[in-house]
C-alpha cells in the first residue's frame, strides 16, 4: 500500500516568517557532546533562553546528578538506559516529571541517554551550577 499524497489545507496561503520567527533545525547527531561539571555526564543543549532549557544528556554507567531542587517544572524522557532516584526508576520509553520544589539525587546505574526539559536552572545542595546560561558565557 503506497502512502497517500499530503493534502495541502491552505494552498492559497504561503507563510513567510521573518528571520527571528523562522524555525530552527538542529543536526543533533552531529552536535558534539559537551562535558559537564559532573563526572560521567555529557550534554547537548538543544535550546536555552532565560533558564528554559531543552537538552540531551548522556550519563556513563554509575554517573550521578548530585542532590538538587527543581525550582520549576522538570520533565525527562528516557531514550536509553535507566534513571533512578529514591522515588522510582524510569526506563527506555518512559517519562517522569517533577514539580517545583522536588528534591532528589539521580543515578544511571547502567548509563542512560535522556531528553530533559527545564523551565529554570536547578538549585544544587552544594551550590554547583549545571547547564545554566552563566556557564555558557
What would you call each of these model-derived segments?
Residues 61, 70-85, 92:
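Glycine- and acidic-residue-biased ligand/ion/polar-headgroup-sensing regions
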Residues 100-127:
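Ligand-binding loop in jelly-roll beta-barrel domains
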Amino acid at each position: 500500500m503506497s502512502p497517500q499524497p499530503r493534502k495541502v489545507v491552505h494552498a492559497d496561503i504561503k507563510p513567510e516568517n521573518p528571520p527571528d520567527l523562522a524555525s530552527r533545525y538542529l543536526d543533533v547527531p552531529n552536535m558534539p557532546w559537551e562535558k559537564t561539571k559532573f563526572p560521567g555526564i555529557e550534554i547537548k543543549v538543544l535550546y536555552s533562553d532565560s533558564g528554559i532549557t531543552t537538552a540531551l544528556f548522556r550519563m556513563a554507567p554509575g554517573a550521578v546528578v548530585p542532590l538538587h531542587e527543581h525550582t520549576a517544572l522538570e520533565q525527562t524522557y528516557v531514550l536509553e538506559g535507566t534513571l533512578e532516584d529514591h522515588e522510582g526508576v524510569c526506563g527506555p520509553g518512559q517519562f517522569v516529571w517533577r514539580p517545583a520544589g522536588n528534591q532528589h539525587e539521580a543515578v544511571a546505574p547502567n548509563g542512560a541517554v535522556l531528553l530533559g526539559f527545564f523551565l529554570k536552572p536547578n538549585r544544587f545542595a552544594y551550590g554547583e551550577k549545571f547547564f545554566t546560561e552563566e556557564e555558557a558565557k
